[in-house]
């Protein structure tokens, strides 16, 4: 990711997420740990909405092996948040999901980060598994051209 703040136009899938009173910390803004919850929610919702992930029975699941978040501007309850999602890279067994967090109707990201998932067999949760065709197809829709 570049060091510049991304804009909404850089993302392909969007999920509105309300902030909650409990998200604020003693400093009056959303605590950093909450951003990772938003990242996870955006990725999971995309996978469910795309028809790839059925949580109780999916034979292939993604495990987070890397995360990062860069913060540019504060967010606080009762702000409205929109998570933007795009596929940064799809390898043989892994995907880099890139997420932008947008405050209210602002065009510049308040935070940006990524998750890297390695896809594994659900039963062993150890054996890396090639990305299924259905996942590759879904990722094509959120991969910038």
Where are these regions (language model features)?
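HotDog/MaoC-like acyl-thioester-processing domains
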Residues: 1-13, 75-77, 88-145
């Amino acid at each position: 990711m570049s060091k510049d703040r991304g804009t909404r136009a850089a993302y392909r899938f969007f999920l509105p997420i309300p902030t909650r009173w409990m998200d604020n910390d003693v400093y009056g803004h959303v605590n950093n740990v909450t951003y990772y919850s938003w990242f996870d929610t955006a990725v999971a919702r995309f996978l469910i909405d795309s028809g790839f992930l059925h949580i109780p029975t999916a034979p292939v699941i993604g495990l987070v092996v890397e995360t990062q978040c860069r913060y540019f501007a504060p967010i606080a309850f009762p702000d409205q948040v929109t998570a933007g999602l795009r596929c940064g890279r799809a390898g043989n067994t892994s995907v880099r999901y890139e997420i932008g967090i947008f405050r209210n109707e602002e065009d510049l990201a308040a935070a940006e980060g990524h998750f890297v998932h390695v896809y594994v067999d659900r039963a062993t949760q150890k054996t890396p598994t090639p990305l299924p065709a259905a996942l590759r197809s879904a990722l094509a829709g959120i991969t910038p051209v």
